[in-house]
């Protein structure tokens, strides 16, 4: 019985670590703004996104990398240009009832 509880605790810890990284990535006003712009405009390159964000390309690239590493956005390279878009599947999963069940079992 103790072994089962330890395994469940480790599994929950791993799940929390997974979500911690995702939520840290979006817990920033600038990154939320980037996500909102991508929601409204779809796929965009840094050169078009930077003026909308009123941010240098290097600073924008820093924020995009964090969102990419968390799999919140996707990147597609076409020639020398990189285009970014929201990863809808990941966002749907992140905002799904599955996560709700961890904290509010009655919703499941």
What are these regions (language model features)?
Residues 48-50:
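A short acidic, leucine-rich amphipathic alpha-helix
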Residues 29, 41-45:
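Short capping segments at the starts of secondary-structure elements
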Residues 69-78, 85:
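Beta-hairpin "wing" of winged helix-turn-helix
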Residues 1-26, 70-72, 92-94, 106-108:
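N-terminal leader segment of winged-helix/HTH proteins
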Residues 18-19, 40, 83-108:
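Conserved segment of winged-helix/HTH DNA-binding domains
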Residues 35, 64-65:
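Short, hydrophobic-biased segments on the C-terminal half of alpha helices
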Residues 56-59:
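Helix-turn-helix DNA-binding motif, specifically the short coil turn and the N-cap/start of the second
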Residues 32-39:
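Pre-recognition alpha-helix immediately N-terminal to the DNA-recognition helix
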């Amino acid at each position: 019985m103790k072994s089962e509880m330890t395994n469940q605790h480790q599994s929950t810890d791993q799940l929390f670590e997974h979500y911690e990284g995702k939520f840290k990535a979006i817990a920033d006003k600038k990154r939320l703004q980037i996500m909102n712009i991508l929601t409204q405009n779809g796929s965009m390159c840094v050169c078009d996104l930077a003026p909308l964000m009123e941010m240098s390309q290097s600073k924008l690239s820093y924020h995009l990398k964090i969102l990419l590493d968390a799999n919140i956005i996707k990147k597609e390279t076409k020639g020398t240009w990189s285009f970014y878009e929201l990863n809808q599947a990941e966002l749907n999963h992140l905002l799904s009832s599955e996560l709700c069940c961890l904290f509010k079992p009655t919703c499941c």
